[in-house]
């Protein structure tokens, strides 16, 4: 399961700055769910090879009536959900009573807590941070979140002790990256025009991903806003009342994993808690965790994003969709409650979906009624199609041919007067499909050309329902950093030119 890291502390100690640094976004948001609690933000991060979910909370100000009684509820829930709590303090402001109160609360919760002294740039960090050892929470880590100094080392030290939970995630990533490393080693020795050489490379790449592809149990996560019919759809798929259904948002509090078999194929259906709007649910229902939904997305092979046809697509849906795409999961759009709508309303809903979801035209869209069962059976065809596309094996020779066809039809743009050269492509991973393109100056390719390549590969490989990721590897220049040694005649000529230039300036 993806680990969870919560950022807590007083106001203005740099929690949001660190959140932005970890999630690599400037809007403090990778998956924003306004209304879960007023100031909590969720994001997906990958630092030092570790995948994790990070929670940014509002500042805790307990200086007036005590932290124990006035701890902000969003921070309380974040602490409960987290595997590790990063307790941020301000190294410049020093230790204040609110820090002591927060530390006392954290010690009572017996959560893995790391004290992080932020804003250590431009000061004698060791002397300023010494007083934070009074908090009794162990070592004090020093960072400067605004500049990013110490952040990678912090995450490496914090997440490494989680052991097996993280090793499994890191092993999957290593499997995807190992193919890239092998191809880099063979770049100069292999002839990618030679079928025997490319066959050997493909065989090596297959060994890295064979185990994950051969897992035939397809995990399907059903996600969406509250009361869009997720549990009703789950029960309709299962053919029995396995999940409580009630016409009130927030009935499902946790992610429920249910195994099933259909036409000889093993599935695991994951019914998740809804992601609700601000002020739409009462305090008792607010205790369910959206973290479970985010983790279910990470754990799934295919995600069914369920939308209420009567309410249309909302910003909540788009936020959730962004998290699904960032996680690289296959996607099927399910528009529920389609029954009983007039043809004019149906046309209006379809037009709105086309307008707001034009950037995911690769995903199948199904219009169903989970209550009556119409259209539900067709979902499995799209699920199997998306999973097959996400895990299909492509040879190096095929990908290289497609790359050259794309370059022939639309040549890469000039960079500083030189044409970007695309050498070859090979598979770099599966679920989602990763294509690694090697060449010269590829890091300078315009985003528009990268999108062109992505769309060209998708069309050529007929990938439906799955995002596709393209990574670029710069070819090593053997002459980089080297200077030609001038001959004596060249040195004399250079001196004459320098003298001429100096005289001209006078």
Curated annotation (Swiss-Prot):
Residues annotated for GTP 1 binding in this entry: 9-16, 56-60, 118-121
Cited Gene3D superfamilies: 3.30.300.20, P-loop containing nucleotide triphosphate hydrolases
Residue span(s) of domain KH-like: 392-476
GO annotation, biological process: ribosome biogenesis
Binding positions (GTP 2): 224-231, 271-275, 336-339
The keyword Nucleus belongs to this UniProt entry's keyword annotation: no
Source species, domain of life: Bacteria
Disulfide bonds: none
Record GO terms (molecular function): ATP hydrolysis activity; GTP binding; ribosome binding
A UniProt-annotated Pfam family: KH_dom-like
Keywords: GTP-binding, Nucleotide-binding, Repeat, Ribosome biogenesis
Ranges of residues in domain EngA-type G: 3-166, 218-391
The keyword Iron is annotated on this UniProt entry: no
Database matches in InterPro entries: AAA+_ATPase, G_ENGA, GTP-bd, GTPase_Der, KH_dom-like, KH_dom-like_a/b, P-loop_NTPase, Small_GTP-bd
Family under the similarity heading: Belongs to the TRAFAC class TrmE-Era-EngA-EngB-Septin-like GTPase superfamily. EngA (Der) GTPase family.
Oligomer status and interactors: Associates with the 50S ribosomal subunit.
Function: GTPase that plays an essential role in the late steps of ribosome biogenesis.
Name of the featured protein: GTPase Der
Gene name of this polypeptide: der
């Amino acid at each position: 399961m993806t680990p969870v890291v919560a950022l807590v502390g007083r106001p203005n100690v740099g929690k949001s700055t660190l959140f932005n640094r970890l999630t690599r976004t400037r809007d403090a948001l990778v998956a924003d769910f306004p209304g879960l609690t007023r100031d909590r933000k969720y994001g997906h991060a990958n630092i030092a090879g570790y995948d994790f979910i990070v929670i940014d909370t509002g500042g805790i100000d307990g200086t007036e009536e005590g932290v124990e009684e006035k701890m902000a509820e969003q921070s309380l829930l974040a602490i409960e959900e987290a595997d590790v709590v990063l307790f941020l303090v301000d190294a410049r402001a020093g230790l204040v009573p609110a820090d002591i109160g927060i530390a006392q609360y954290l010690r009572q919760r017996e959560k893995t807590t790391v004290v992080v002294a932020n804003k250590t740039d431009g000061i004698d960090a060791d002397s300023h941070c010494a007083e934070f050892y009074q908090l009794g929470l162990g070592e004090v880590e020093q960072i400067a979140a605004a500049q990013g100094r110490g952040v990678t080392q912090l995450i490496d030290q914090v997440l490494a002790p989680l052991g097996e939970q993280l090793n499994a995630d890191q092993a999957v990533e290593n499997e995807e990256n190992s193919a890239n490393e092998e191809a880099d080693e063979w770049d100069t020795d292999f002839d990618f025009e030679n079928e025997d050489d490319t066959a050997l490379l493909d065989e090596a790449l297959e060994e890295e991903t064979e185990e994950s592809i051969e897992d035939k149990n397809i995990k399907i996560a059903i996600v969406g806003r509250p009361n869009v019919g997720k549990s009703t759809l789950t029960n309709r798929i299962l053919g029995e009342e396995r999940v409580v259904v009630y016409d009130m948002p927030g009935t499902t509090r946790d992610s429920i994993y249910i195994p099933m078999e259909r036409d000889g194929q093993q599935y695991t259906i994951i019914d998740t808690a809804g992601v609700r709007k601000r002020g739409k649910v009462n305090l008792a229902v607010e205790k369910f965790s959206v973290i479970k939904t985010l983790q279910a997305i990470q754990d799934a092979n295919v995600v069914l994003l369920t939308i209420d046809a009567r309410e249309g697509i909302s910003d909540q849906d788009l936020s959730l969709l962004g998290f699904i795409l960032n996680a690289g999961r296959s996607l099927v759009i399910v528009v529920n409650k389609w029954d009983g709508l007039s043809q004019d309303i149906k046309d209006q809903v379809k037009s709105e979906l086309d307008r707001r979801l034009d950037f995911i035209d690769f995903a199948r869209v199904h219009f169903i009624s989970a209550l009556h069962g119409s259209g539900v059976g067709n979902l499995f065809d799209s699920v199997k199609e998306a999973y097959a596309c996400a895990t299909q094996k492509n040879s190096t020779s095929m990908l290289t041919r497609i790359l050259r066809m794309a370059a022939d039809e639309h040549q890469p743009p000039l960079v500083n007067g030189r044409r970007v050269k695309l050498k070859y492509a090979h598979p770099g991973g599966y679920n989602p499909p990763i294509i690694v393109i090697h060449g010269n100056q590829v890091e300078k390719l315009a985003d528009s050309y990268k999108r062109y390549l992505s769309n060209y590969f998708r069309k050529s490989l007929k990938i439906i329902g799955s995002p596709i990721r393209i990574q670029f590897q710069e070819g090593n220049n053997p002459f980089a950093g080297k200077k030609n040694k001038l001959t004596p005649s060249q040195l004399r000529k250079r001196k004459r030119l320098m003298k001429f230039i100096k005289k001209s300036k006078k």
